[in-house]
Amino acid sequence: MSFLHLAIVLPFIVALLIPLFYRWTKQVHTGWLVLPIPVILFIYFLTFIPKTMDGATIVSMPWIPRLGINFTVVVDGLSLLFALLITGIGSLVTFYSIYYLGKKKERLSNFYTFLFIFMTAMLGVVLSDNLIVLYLFWELTSISSFLLIGYWYHRERSRYGARKSMMITVFGGLMMLGGFILLHIMSDSFSIREIISNADVISNNSLFIPAMILILLGAFTKSAQVPFHIWLPDAMEAPTPVSAYLHSATMVKAGIYIVARFTPLFASSGVWFWTVSLVGITTLFWGSLNATKKNDLKAILAYSTISQLGLIMALLGVGAASLHFDTLSDDIYVMAIVAAVFHLFNHATFKGSLFMMVGIVDHETGTRDIRRLGGLMRIMPITATIAFIGTFAMAGIPPFNGFLSKEMFFESMVNITQLQLFDASTWGVLLPVVAWVASVFTFVYSMIIFFKTFTGKVKPYLLPKKPHEAPFGLLLPPIILSIFVVGIGLFPNLIAEPILEPAVRAIVPGLSTDFSIHISLWHGFTPALLMTFGVVALGIVLFLTHKYWKPWITTKVPKALRIGKTYDNGMYYLEQGSYRMTMFIMTGWLRTYLNYMLSAFILMMASVMIFTQALDFNFSSMTKVTVVDFVLAAVILVTLVGIVFSKSRITSIILLGAMGYTISIFFVISRAPDLALTQLIIETISVVLYLLVFYHLPQFSNIEEKPKWLSMKTFLSIGVGVIITLVSLSAYNTTFYDSISKYYVDNAYVEAAGRNIVNVILVDFRGFDTMFETAVLSIAAIGIYAMIKLRLTKRGENDENE
């Protein structure tokens, strides 16, 4: 295992150890013990920056090589950017949680176990080159996020939010798995690099579009794109450190990563271009609009996250057009990819600081409701400064980093009208219009967060706690992120060459060697800057009149667009349908369950034999049936009929024993004396046990059965018998593989020094099978003995009490 593989699994290993050392270190906050892990990983991944500027680092470890499944790790510009965000933000969140979560009140071992499992899952997603390994880590993110969102499981809303996120993201994951399988069918490889290298061949396959749609479903569900965005607002029931980590920099960016990673493969299709662009721009608009009507600070940030994710998704969709040009060094559509990568980084910084700021406000005032907040700037000046930087960066105001990437976003949306592909020059005019309107709402909700929380009058009578400034431990992580927001805004080229360029090259492999990124705070009077002026002007008007139009958009949204209600209704009817089906199937009668199982067996086996044409029998090669065989078969048939229609238990037992002894004669004729002896012993013991047990049972009563049950029993009995007979004949006449009998004959004496082949098979070749069967029987015997002994003990106690 390489250091890269160890870096991925290290948080998971630590997560497994946390419950062990937690009980011995309760005097120390668990966060202090685990904090070095993400810090060390962040420093480790920083060392890859020079390497990714020269190319990707690839390390592979065999896992299931025969199936083409290897744990291959690739560190290129894109995966490194995400790895730095995962470990960097993870370090700050871990530090923040030490002061946010009380040592005595919270289940810290659970929290950090779930958090570090999630960290491993995210690192695995962004660093894995193998599709199957990526999918396993992908689903681990869903499971660990479910545990984190439902951390306060005693709250009904937390459980609801956790279930909702799990249902939607796991659904998307399964769809994405289907897309991965289709890619494997088309390319005969699970390696993402190999699949992308064969993009020209794969794009002509009939499975290309279905694979694309399935993979996009997985990406859209994870990154909360419309209409799958409904899980993210309910996920805000998680503790604020979880929201700051999962819902600003990591989990919700996983879908963005998938779209960016597969852009070189699918960008040739107009379906990819329009689907990603339109879903992204729709999500941008819908998220920003809904954020303006919320009163909970976390809810506003949730919808703002949805909106910002849509912005990045739209940029990736527009940027896909860049792969259609031969000369990419000065292609204007490459700048859309640059803007997407840049805003992905910027969003993690300002949104992470804002989530932490909201956590501080909630922690120190006891509420997140903006109707109860106000005037906190005088009481919490440092927190107010953090909020000012974060909200103005999110609104796209200079000199913060959000302004730069927002300008690049506007420029990319305007340039799409010049694209002579996919009819973008006509329909593409809608994208800059919607983008501008959505940006106006983005400005409005950003101002709502800051001004309605920190300006105006303090309302102490509405606050559960007396507000005060947070301790330095809570303030330090958002301060660090705010420094990045300002620093990158003033000096954006600090990250342009070492981080942004390698990431863009990973998404657009055909970039020329002289391609470089240069970002400046002042770039002249451009259409993008004029759009920003318009956003600010109209945004101020809408903010000042917010109380007048907010009720209108709150009440006038058509019911058809309330997707959350549709989800709730769907889950309700699904649960009701499942309950009714369960009540129909689970009758409590053993015969009902047997009927279901036997009916399914008959239908499945009959269907398989018919569709595989397995009913072609050759009787000429079979052993000839003698008179003795006929007599023995007749005896077995007579005893079976007698057992079925017998009115006496004793008679049934005797007939059952007679049938077993007759079968042993078959073994003697077939020259299998060991089997015959075993059969005789088993039959004798069985008859004796039956007689002993039946002696203690109540008197046999003949229950009159309804004709329909008798008919069902008859049909199933005959059906199973016929199917077993046909399967036996088919298996005898159909040989897909060479018989293994010759292997046992040749090796029984040589390998095991045994002349009795049956004994050698049971004891040597299938020794483990025999041993475990013996173990199962022993466990069953112990269970029966314990039940009998417990019953006798209770009976003795009762007698003694009497």
Tell me the role of every PLM-derived stretch.
Residues 654, 681-685, 690-694:
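Conserved RecA-like P-loop NTPase helicase motor core
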Residues 687-692, 704, 708, 754-756, ...:
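C-terminal transmembrane helix pair
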Residues 495-534, 540-654, 658, 662-667, ...:
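Aromatic-capped, Gly/Pro-kinked transmembrane alpha-helices
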Residues 669-670, 693:
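Conserved thiamine diphosphate
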Residues 73, 345-347, 373, 589, ...:
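Hydrophobic alpha-helical elements at and bordering transmembrane segments
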Residues 1-497, 520-550, 575, 592-612, ...:
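...captures the hydrophobic TM-helix bundle architecture rather than a specific catalytic motif
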Residues 1-2, 672-687:
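Membrane-embedded alpha-helical segments of integral membrane proteins
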Residues 696, 700-701:
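Membrane-interface junctions at the ends of membrane-embedded or membrane-associated helices
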